[in-house]
């Protein structure tokens, strides 16, 4: 990531949603920010979309916002097929 990350902010309800609804562990979502290659796109309302992989090789789609130099994860799930195609493009 071009911007240095000084940590992550996790809200309890987000962690619950990731685990219960999407089956994604917060540590997996964090790994996607450091495992190359990854892609980041700016979305609306100051949100960013990260397309990356966990250390176990899961293809993850992560929605986040910057809070200073920390990342606040809003959602994370496995990529859909069209997102995997986008991620695979150079």
State where each predicted segment sits.
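Ribonuclease/tRNase effector modules and their secretory precursors
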Residues: 1-90
């Amino acid at each position: 990531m071009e911007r240095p990350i000084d940590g992550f902010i996790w809200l309890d309800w987000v962690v619950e949603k990731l685990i219960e609804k999407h089956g994604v562990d917060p540590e997996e979502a964090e790994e996607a920010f450091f495992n190359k290659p990854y892609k980041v796109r700016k979305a609306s309302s100051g949100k960013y979309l990260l397309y990356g992989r966990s250390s176990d090789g899961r293809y993850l789609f992560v929605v986040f916002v910057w809070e200073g130099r920390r990342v606040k994860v809003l959602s994370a799930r496995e990529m859909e097929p069209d997102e995997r195609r986008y991620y695979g493009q150079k």
